[in-house]
Regions:
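Walker B catalytic acidic pair
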Residues: 165-166, 177
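Pre-Walker A (pre-P-loop) alpha-helix and adjacent loop at the N terminus of AAA/AAA+ ATPase modules
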Residues: 65-97, 103
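Conserved C-terminal "switch" segment of AAA+ ATPases
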Residues: 77, 231-304, 334, 339, ...
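Walker A/P-loop
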Residues: 93-128
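Canonical AAA+ ATPase core
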Residues: 145-147, 170, 174, 182-262, ...
Length: 381
């Protein structure tokens, strides 16, 4: 059922067309409750049927609920991997890239495909193999007889969402081509440079089980990723739900898939702006900096930390922690960033940026254990 109601902001009144699909927000006006669609600005009109800046701000105050609904929707199809789903949304909103490490069959591919079905954008999977060439990723120049000239044929990197499957199975040249595109947001071929879309997210995967014949990513390239997420097997209850979902999907295989309401790219960009403006107190900002400095000067926080940490976190890591903490807080529908939000994303942001010593490895100390010690020892300013 569609309802049109009047929303007030200051002395102005706006007519808002209701849509009871993804991204609904509850409003109570004159003791009556209505829903306003938040994911797609085209659903919001004023009396002249035009989208206005004022109504954008009105809707923007609660637009995080659209992404909360998106999180819930994805969790219904990606069962037992809530952490992965949440980190995927954080990477989307923080405008970064994700490195996911997990055994085969844990819904890594399914997660980003389901996300692509729910946002306005296109998706491409790149299977990394030892014989892959850089041009297979970025594209190549093709000679056309019609005009006797070379024309650039864009590769799969020119999509909004990219799955770089088993990135450590391709040679360093191919990895560098992808990581350069991730860092510079452009591809250079010959004398020409081609910009990538504003909405650009790469989710790269690694298989921790089979390491033979792989090309491990060096630390300098790992630093390009916003987060390094490790995922494990679902629990017994989730396994039951996965079986039920798989049977339901199999029985509906021949049926026409329901068209999902998509969140527009504009809504994503507006969400990013809100996240950048989220309030962060000087104490929380100092806490982020102290966490980074503790990885560079670990002796201040204990001789054992100094013995375990070889290289600390770069300034890019500090920036990444700030962006991820803001995005995490925003997804919780908070209007400020707390130390708990920083700690919630700390492992995924620092995991691939702290290099531990051989002595730590000999003692069986992992990077995650080092990060746990940082959380316990670094006080909030």
């Amino acid at each position: 059922m569609k309802v049109i109601f009047i929303a007030k902001k200051g002395a102005k009144r706006y007519s808002i067309k209701n849509s009871s699909l993804l991204g609904n927000c509850l409003f109570t006006i004159n003791r009556l409750t209505y829903f306003a669609h938040l994911g797609n600005p085209q659903k919001v009109l004023n009396r002249n049927n035009t989208f206005t800046k004022e109504i954008s701000e009105f809707i923007g105050m609660t637009s995080s609920s659209a992404f909360k609904e998106l999180n819930h929707s994805l969790s219904q199809t990606i069962i037992g991997q809530h952490h992965l789903v949440e980190r995927l949304l954080i990477a989307l909103l923080a405008d970064g890239h994700l490195l996911v490490e997990g055994a085969p069959g844990l819904a890594k591919t399914k997660a980003i495909k389901e996300l692509s079905d729910r946002i306005e954008g296109n998706f491409q999977r790149i299977q990394f193999t030892p014989d892959l060439l850089p041009s297979d990723v970025t594209g190549t120049e093709i000679y056309r007889v019609e005009d006797g000239a070379f024309h650039f044929q864009k590769g799969p990197i020119f999509h909004n969402l990219i799955l770089a499957d088993e990135i450590n199975r391709a040679p360093a040249k191919v990895q560098s081509a992808l990581l350069e595109a991730m860092g510079e947001r452009q591809v250079s071929v010959g004398k020409e440079t081609f910009p990538l879309d504003k909405l650009f997210l790469v989710m790269a995967t690694q298989n921790p089980i089979e390491q033979e014949g792989t090309y491990p990513l060096p630390e300098a390239q790992l630093d390009r990723f916003l987060m390094h997420v490790k995922i494990g097997y679902p629990n017994q209850e989730s396994e039951h739900s996965i079986l039920k979902l798989a049977r339901a999907e199999q029985s509906q295989n021949d049926k026409v898939k329901e068209t999902l309401e998509k969140i527009s790219q504009q809504a994503i960009f507006e969400g990013r702006e809100e996240i950048n403006k989220l309030h962060m107190s000087p104490a929380v900002e100092e806490y982020i900096i102290h966490l980074t400095m503790a990885t560079r000067q670990p002796a201040k926080y204990g001789d054992d930390l100094a013995r375990w940490i070889d290289f600390g976190v770069s300034p890019r890591g500090t920036i990444s922690l700030d962006r991820c903490a803001r995005a995490y807080a925003w997804l919780q529908q908070k209007d400020f960033v707390s130390p708990d939000d920083v700690r919630a994303v700390l492992h995924d942001v620092y995991r691939h940026r702290i290099l531990i010593t051989f002595e730590a490895e000999a003692e069986g100390i992992t990077t995650d254990q080092v990060i746990n010690e940082l959380i316990h020892r670094v006080p909030v300013a």
